[in-house]
Regions:
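Short aromatic-glycine-(Arg/Gly/Cys) micro-motifs in beta-strand/loop hairpins
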Residues: 1-20, 48-53, 61
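Short, mixed-charge low-complexity intrinsically disordered segments
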Residues: 31-64
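Short, flexible N-terminal segments of the mature chain
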Residues: 11-36
Length: 64
């Protein structure tokens, strides 16, 4: 299992298939989401967390 964390160690929660997800079974999917968040300038609609996307960069994938 993998999770995405911001620079402060907080987990990122996203909405996928109408479900909120914090843990990913695939490292590839977690890396894709992480790369997207690192290049994004504004908060995407599918991001559940209420923190500043730009100020919390870089996002990293951690193994749980």
């Amino acid at each position: 299992m993998f999770k995405i964390v911001n620079r402060y160690g907080k987990s990122v929660t996203v909405v996928m298939r109408m479900e909120e997800k914090t843990l990913f079974t695939s490292e590839v999917l977690a890396n894709i989401v992480c790369k997207f968040l690192n290049t994004k300038k504004t908060k995407p609609d599918w991001l559940v967390n209420n923190f500043d996307v730009v100020a919390c960069k870089p996002y990293m994938v951690e193994k749980v």
